[in-house]
Amino acid sequence: MNINKESIHGFLKQCERVLRISKKPDNEEYLTVAKVTGVGIIIIGLIGFILSIVSQVLFYS
């Protein structure tokens, strides 16, 4: 891996560009992301619970 001054400078310029473009989410966007994440976690949990119940019924009866 060859690290030189130009590659470090280029990386820092890219980081600066990303930080300039990015913004803090407003309350509405934050709540939407939180709701979608929560619903996704609940759905994955329900799928795991249903699979657990089905496997117990099929293999332990």
Curated annotation (Swiss-Prot):
Q: Which regions form coiled coils?
A: none
Q: Does the keyword Cell division apply?
A: no
Q: Indicate where this protein resides in the cell.
A: Cell membrane
What InterPro entries is this protein classified in?
Prot_translocase_SecE_dom_sf, Translocase_Sec61-g, Translocase_SecE/Sec61-g
Q: Is the keyword Ribonucleoprotein assigned to this protein? A: no
Q: Which UniProt keywords apply?
A: Cell membrane, Membrane, Protein transport, Translocation, Transmembrane, Transmembrane helix, Transport
Please give the chief subcellular localization of this protein: membrane
List, in alphabetical order, the GO biological process terms annotated in this UniProt record: intracellular protein transmembrane transport; protein secretion; protein targeting
TM spans (from-to): 39-59
User: According to its record, how does it sit in the membrane?
Assistant: Single-pass membrane protein
GO CC annotations on file: plasma membrane
Job description of the protein: Essential subunit of the Sec protein translocation channel SecYEG. Clamps together the 2 halves of SecY. May contact the channel plug during translocation.
Q: State the name under which the record lists this protein.
A: Protein translocase subunit SecE
User: Encoded by which gene?
Assistant: secE
